[in-house]
Amino acid sequence: PNHAMHHIAASGSLTRQWSADIGDGSSDEAQLLAQPVIAGGIVYTVDINAEVSAFDQKNGKRLWQVELSKDDDNEGILGGGIAIHDGRLFATTGFADVVALDAKSGREIWRKRLSGPIRAAPTVWAGRVFAATVANELYALSADDGRELWTHSGLREVAGLVGGAAPAVDAGVVVVPYSSGEVVALRVENGRQVWTESLTPIRRSDAVSAIAHIRGQPVIDRGIVYIVGNSNRTVAVDLRTGNRLWEVP
């Protein structure tokens, strides 16, 4: 949940063990954005049509496959992602659904429709599922049954990049980046704002650099939040106080 990967190194040379078809990939109309996740010896994937698949990590054998879209018109809709926690796979979709599946069988446990499309994967922590819509609205849902626990609304922004960043959580605080350039820290239990930060571009040399959207995932490591904006601004913020510790323009 805190996105801190630290220094990962592969032991020895890498060789292909297996490959598998996960469904439809990127095209002129849609981009495959969702990353795979691995847990309990199973690899989980989702394609551009919100088709979730589970494969045996050892040999690539398909264990199950589930189509999350309930409408053929939703095929090829951009966005979404997956996260796993406590035996459940949680998926967000570009057609505004958050879905909880049994990780072993793919059986649907619950489904919650949000106010708008979701471009990034959900984040799960302490019995709560956090998902942000393209309209910069963060939802905190119960991981048990999908009940809405609280919401937070950021500033609206018309222009944005393809995709989005999943919230980061640590020490009872969820940090969510919005396409407006805002970064907001909230208490996980009630959504109360702890602090807010802005990575709005200072120098706008072209149309792309003028976009404030934060595409990279925030990272929380040992009480410090690291954030990178679209204009290459990197800031480090104290998780508890919100004080900016340093910045690289």
Task: Annotate each language-model stretch with its function.
Residues P1-G12:
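Sequence/structural signature of beta-propeller modules
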Residues S13, W18-V37, Q65-A83, W110-W125, ...:
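Extracytoplasmic beta-rich repeat domains
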Residues D47, I77, T93-G94, T133-V134, ...:
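Structural signature of WD-repeat beta-propellers
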Residues D47-L68, S179-S180, A207, H213-E247:
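Beta-propeller domains
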Residues D56-N59, D102-S105, S142-G146, R187-G191, ...:
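Short loop/turn segments that connect beta-strands within beta-propeller blades
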